[in-house]
Design a protein with these regions (language model features):
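Divalent metal-cofactor coordination and adjacent catalytic microenvironments
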Residues: 1-91
């Protein structure tokens, strides 16, 4: 799966429009960087298994109140779980 595929899935789940695609893709890249630095393998990041956490992250950032931006605990917990799973081929 490519970043464009992931972006399209996140946009669909959140009910956003194509107009916001570039912004959403920037948020997704930020989430991917976070996941990668947390030890999640690229094979998991670029799979269906990361769509849920990516949706959570984009939703957190999309709906922030100025000065109170936080990523959700659920996103953080899911990233931790995925980091322990190793490559898709090993699961």
């Amino acid at each position: 799966m490519t970043i464009n595929d992931l972006t399209n899935k996140v946009i669909l789940v959140l009910g956003l429009t194509e107009y916001h695609k570039d912004l959403v893709q920037n948020y997704i890249q930020d989430a991917i960087d976070y996941m990668r630095s947390s030890g999640v393998s690229d094979s998991i990041i670029y799979s269906q298994r990361s769509v849920g956490p990516l949706v959570m992250y984009v939703n957190d950032i999309w709906n922030y109140t100025q000065g109170q931006t936080r990523i959700s605990e659920l996103f953080e917990q899911r990233v931790i779980q995925l980091s322990y799973e190793g490559d898709d081929e090993d699961v």
